[in-house]
Amino acid sequence: MMLSVFGLSVPISATELLLASFVFCLVFWVVRAWQPRVPKGLKSPPGPWGWPLLGHVLTLGKNPHLVLARLSQHYGDVLQIRIGSTPVLVLSGLDTIRQALVRQGDDFKGRPNLYSFTLISEGQSMSFSPDSGPVWAARRRLAQNALKSFSIASDPASSSSCYLEDHVSKEAEYLIGKFQELMAKVGHFDPYRYVVVSVANVICAMCFGRRYDHDDQELLSIVNLSNEFGDGTASGNPVDFFPILRYLPNPALDFFKDVNEKFSIFIHKMVKEHYKTFEKGHIRDITDSLIEHCQDKRLDENANIQLSDEKIVNVVSDLFGAGFDTVTTAISWCLMYLVTSPNVQEKIQKELDTVIGRERQPRLSDRLQLPYMEAFILEMFRHTSFVPFTIPHSTTKDTSLSGFYIPKERCVFVNQWQINHDQKLWGDPSEFRPERFLTPDGTINKALSEKVILFGLGKRKCIGETIARLEVFLFLAILLQQVEFSVPQGTKVDMTPIYGLTMKHARCEHFQVRMRT
């Protein structure tokens, strides 16, 4: 038998033809078997063809948020890719994401059972573990209440309005003194290395009731690992989708395991010390508050759900992480924009002088009277979108979205970067323009500000969002009231985001400050 292929005659036996037909049918049957049966009236999400075995991992490259944003322009706000053999639903568009995470929040509140997540808090992280049931919900409420009690609740021992204001004020004043000292010694500095410790000190004060020296090696060893943690938990980590990578030599994975082990040892140590000194009726911080709940043996008023000693460590670990990395990254990006847009810095300082003056320190209660500063922070959140994806979600049951069928336990990527750079929403998304958030009368455009998505939405929304926004505001207000940031003329400042769970910028060692007169 002769088979014609591209105009060429190729000899082939009947047996070979039969075998080829059998293999083709087998592959077709396996592919069909893997695909979920779509209920009548619904469709499967569209998406590009991927490579066998690899899926779209090569397509995603080093900046998956950008690639997936471009794909959404072609395939729509609900599309599907494969990483390895794992199907992944990708959501874009503000309305679509609100529909999924808010209006259908119960359907999309799960977490995928990814390998990298099992390495965080011994697989029991409130933020990363697949659990989304009653115990998880009760732990989340407890964590929120504890965080609120030792952040925005009033501090009877201080003249500040709340614990957070007291802690941030002290750390901001320390930074101003440190920056002056560095200017006198060497004439320039990298602010990130000092901001990161000050922010860590704020969450340490709330969680553990203590402040560290900026050269304390124990704390430095923890805070300097934040970049590596973000690399390991970023959406699309190959080790989560190609199991063989867990067994091959993998320095990045080994390092990620080491990061989590060191962090776990640190948190265990702090919680153990609190148990030794705990006094009922004398609650000093978040950890004490959780211990008290543990000893009361009830986590929820309406359910017999208990908080074990081990879970305290996991909750504290989540709160420390939520209150640390995001705030550090936000303040660091703010400083970068201030030195690259000196006119913006000048406007913020003029507003501070008009509203507060120099006779007293800024307070959290001043926030509503400083709309330009608030607009600057909102525009930094939007323009950087430094949390490009939420932590991956997972569907808790078979569901549908925008006419597409989504089966249970489908991994879901939520592209926050795409929302914040959607031309239909922003017109000129590439431009850094804080004024876009101001109304003609100079107040914040609330409707537009709510379209900036950085902390997630719905039932998995970041529990530290309110605290983070307040902390970033107060750090900046105190710093900018007293000092002016700059870099030497002609210095190139690299503003290129580096992909990760939170996207950082290249470190800049050329910062300078001068005291405002």
From Swiss-Prot:
Annotated residues for binding of heme: 462
Key word Membrane present: yes
Biological-process GO terms, alphabetical: amine metabolic process; estrogen metabolic process; hydrogen peroxide biosynthetic process; lipid hydroxylation; long-chain fatty acid metabolic process; phenol-containing compound metabolic process; response to toxic substance; retinol metabolic process
EC number(s) given by UniProt: 1.14.14.1, 4.2.1.152
CDD domains membership: CYP1A
UniProt subcellular location: Endoplasmic reticulum membrane; Mitochondrion inner membrane; Microsome membrane; Cytoplasm
GO cellular component: endoplasmic reticulum membrane; intracellular membrane-bounded organelle; mitochondrial inner membrane
Catalytic activity: an organic molecule + reduced [NADPH--hemoprotein reductase] + O2 = an alcohol + oxidized [NADPH--hemoprotein reductase] + H2O + H(+); estrone + reduced [NADPH--hemoprotein reductase] + O2 = 2-hydroxyestrone + oxidized [NADPH--hemoprotein reductase] + H2O + H(+); estrone + reduced [NADPH--hemoprotein reductase] + O2 = 4-hydroxyestrone + oxidized [NADPH--hemoprotein reductase] + H2O + H(+); estrone + reduced [NADPH--hemoprotein reductase] + O2 = 6alpha-hydroxyestrone + oxidized [NADPH--hemoprotein reductase] + H2O + H(+)
Keywords linked to the UniProt accession: Cytoplasm, Endoplasmic reticulum, Glycoprotein, Heme, Iron, Lipid biosynthesis, Lipid metabolism, Lyase, Membrane, Metal-binding, Microsome, Mitochondrion, Mitochondrion inner membrane, Monooxygenase, Oxidoreductase, Steroid biosynthesis
InterPro entries: Cyt_P450, Cyt_P450_CS, Cyt_P450_E_grp-I, Cyt_P450_E_grp-I_CYP1, Cyt_P450_sf
The organism's place on the tree of life at top rank: Eukaryota
Pathway assigned to this chain's UniProt record: Steroid hormone biosynthesis; Lipid metabolism; fatty acid metabolism; Cofactor metabolism; retinol metabolism
Subunit structure: Interacts with cytosolic chaperones HSP70 and HSP90; this interaction is required for initial targeting to mitochondria. Interacts (via mitochondrial targeting signal) with TOMM40 (via N-terminus); this interaction is required for translocation across the mitochondrial outer membrane.
Protein family according to the UniProt entry: Belongs to the cytochrome P450 family.
Protein name, entry field: Cytochrome P450 1A1
Organism: Felis catus
Lineage, top ranks: Eukaryota, Metazoa, Chordata, Craniata, Vertebrata
